[in-house]
Structure formats: structure tokens, C-alpha cells
Amino acid sequence: MMRKNLLLMGFSGSIGKQTLDLLKEDDEYELVGIAANTSYYEVDQILDSFPSITSVAFSGLSSYENSRVKNIYLGDNALLKMIEDNKGAVILNALVGIAGLA
């Protein structure tokens, strides 16, 4: 069975963390992108579990570097740019408040 690409918006919150736990045991989805406001300090640990991640987005950061990630999106339009570059991926929105509606 071909795995579906998945983008996880809001990886640092409780819904995002529960999703990451579930994805570790799942063979239907391949996590290819994660997004958060500013929680950059968690990325390396997530990359250890999900080396399939090629895209990371932070709407609240203006600079971030990580040699393990192919595509890094920053700023106000970071989430939209990541979605546009990963056409066809399933999007799981775990963002809270108004950020989840934008």
C-alpha cells in the first residue's frame, strides 16, 4: 500500500504530540512536514523519529537553520508556503485559536 504524505500543523501542542505518538505506529501515513509557531527546540528529536520529514515551518520565527531539513519556511506565510510546496499531502491541523483558521 502506498503511504500518504502528511503535514502536521501544530506539532508542539498536546494534539500534535499525541499525533506524533500515533504516527510512530502507523504505516498508512508518512510525515513529511511539521509546523509550529516557535518551538524549534523540539525539531531534532522529532527528526530522529521521523527522518522522512523534508519541510519545517515556523510562523513566529524570522531565522532558523537545520542541515537535516531540506525546506524551511519562516514568517507570516510559512504555513501556506509549506502547504503549496507539498501539494497532495494530507493536512492535520492541530493549531489552536485563530492560527488554526488562517
Indicate residue ranges for each PLM-predicted region:
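N-terminal glycine-/serine-/threonine-rich beta1-alpha1-beta2 phosphate-ribose binding loop
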Residues: 1-98
